[in-house]
From Swiss-Prot:
This is Glutamyl-tRNA reductase. It catalyses: (S)-4-amino-5-oxopentanoate + tRNA(Glu) + NADP(+) = L-glutamyl-tRNA(Glu) + NADPH + H(+). Homodimer. The gene is hemA. It comes from Synechococcus sp. (strain RCC307). Gene3D superfamilies: Glutamyl-tRNA reductase, N-terminal domain (3.30.460.30), NAD(P)-binding Rossmann-like Domain (3.40.50.720). Keywords: Chlorophyll biosynthesis, NADP, Oxidoreductase, Porphyrin biosynthesis. It comes from the Bacteria. Pathway: Porphyrin-containing compound metabolism; protoporphyrin-IX biosynthesis; 5-aminolevulinate from L-glutamyl-tRNA(Glu): step 1/2; Porphyrin-containing compound metabolism; chlorophyll biosynthesis.
Length: 442
């Protein structure tokens, strides 16, 4: 068995590549089933966000398993090898474990310490359980990742403050508006006519940050107007107007700052649409959707400034230095949790020996109990038989508790192997070829 992660992120691929590999939630079940159907993939889970697509898997064989996942990504994206493979990374065993813990803690995010990624890791975990694509190994690892993400945020200040893709998008708008005014700093958005396209989680975060940065009147554009109206009720201090996507052209014409965050598979704003609209003022577009909601040719339209998630790096670099020390504190916690998982993983090597030991003792218990009860004849009531059976089971558990704990305990691998061999000799346990297979896979 071999643990690996294969994927890409904002660190390895531009948004035009990432959007080709993005997997919508309603397609995740099919994708998980497709991966699990491959003979090399024993367990698998998918993390798909605006900044990364990563597949965590337990594989029969490292090279063949990784190749199977690369083939899946190529087929899913429709990209030719020269356009895809340079952007993919593959990490194995300890590096894969460390990477997932860093991702869950927000240490690998574009916005260092952002909190939304932990929710996305939780969703990956839940979907893996719901669709039965994960087994005991990934179940334990994903559980550890969620715990680590929570621990980092509770034991350090890395997650404090407004750190998310949405907050960075609002800060980018502040920065660009300030630069228009000759100010190299974040300015209030109180003079901007603002619209937000979308009414999901990201749109909610956008409204929160826009409100804190001075915006007071905002239009929410959404395919379902009722959903936009529900969102608007949560912001009583904002003047929010809601409308459908059929009013998008009017909003492009009347607003000066427009954010997009929808789940659309194709751009909803492009040059052709913008060229057909008459505007009297500059229009700034900030797209945090992946796949992108705004076509790259929108920036070619006169009087239009267009930014996507890759442009958020400018804001990130302004804030990263102040958070690096907090990140170093978090790395210490990650090392502890990584070692805890590795200790558990290494302890699995002793499981076959422990199981055979328990099976052998259970057979002896049953045989001796049967002899004793047969000698007692009908003198024992059913209740008394149950008490004696519980007694013998309790004795076996007590006797085996020490050896079981010793075999599972964190220790050098050779020491564990010596202990397993000693248990086999002492209790005359049968051998198991699977033990050697597991040892070879380590």
């Amino acid at each position: 068995m071999h643990l690996a992660v294969v994927g890409l992120s904002h660190r390895t691929a531009p948004v035009e590549v990432r959007e080709r590999l993005s997997i919508p939630e309603h397609h995740l079940e099919t994708s998980l089933q497709s991966l699990r159907s491959h003979e090399q993939v024993l367990e698998t889970s998918i993390l798909s966000t605006c900044n990364r697509l990563e597949i965590y898997s337990l594989l029969r064989h490292p090279e063949d398993g990784v190749e199977a996942i690369r083939d899946f990504l190529a087929n899913h994206s429709g990209l030719a090898d020269p356009d895809l493979q340079p952007h993919l990374f593959a990490l194995h065993h300890e590096e894969a474990i460390q990477h997932l813990l860093r991702v869950s803690a927000g240490l690998d995010s574009l916005v260092l310490g952002e909190g939304q990624i932990l929710s996305q890791v939780k969703k990956m975990y839940r979907l893996g359980q719901d669709h039965k694509s994960i087994g005991p190994i990934l179940n334990r690892l994903l559980n550890q990742a969620v715990s680590t993400g929570k621990r980092v945020r509770s034991e350090t200040n890395l997650g404090s403050g407004a750190v998310s893709i949405s907050s960075a998008a609002v800060e980018l708008a502040q920065l660009k508006v300030g630069q228009e005014q000759g100010v190299d700093d974040l300015v209030s958005l109180s003079q901007e006519k603002v619209a937000v396209v979308g009414a999901g989680r990201m749109a909610r975060l956008l409204l929160q940050h826009l409100q804190s940065k001075g915006a007071r009147s905002i239009t929410v554009v959404n395919r379902t107007v009722a959903k936009a109206e529900v969102l608007a009720k949560d912001f009583p201090d904002l003047v929010i107007t809601c409308c459908g996507l059929d009013q998008l052209d009017a909003q492009l014409a009347s607003n000066t700052l427009l954010f997009t965050s929808t789940g659309a598979d194709e751009p909803i704003i492009d040059r052709q649409r913008l060229d057909a609209i008459t505007r009297q003022a500059r229009l700034m577009l900030v797209d945090i959707g992946v796949p992108r909601n705004i076509s790259s040719d929108a920036a070619d339209v006169s009087g239009t400034l267009s930014y996507d998630v890759d442009d958020l790096q400018e804001v990130v670099e302004r804030n990263v230095a102040a958070r690096q020390q907090l990140a170093q504190q978090a790395e210490v916690l990650l090392d502890e949790d990584r070692q805890a998982f590795l200790d558990w993983w290494d302890g699995l090597e002793a499981v076959p020996t422990i199981n055979r030991m328990r099976q052998q003792f259970e057979e002896i218990r049953k045989q001796e109990l049967l002899k004793a009860l047969s000698r007692m004849g009908s003198d024992f009531s059913q209740r008394e038989k149950q008490v004696v059976e519980a007694l013998t089971k309790g004795l076996i558990n007590k006797i085996l508790h020490g050896p079981t704990t010793a075999l599972r305990a964190p220790q050098p691998r050779q020491q564990r192997l010596d202990s397993m061999a000693a248990a086999q000799r002492l209790f005359d346990l049968p051998g198991d070829d699977a033990d050697r297979d597991r040892s070879d896979a380590k």
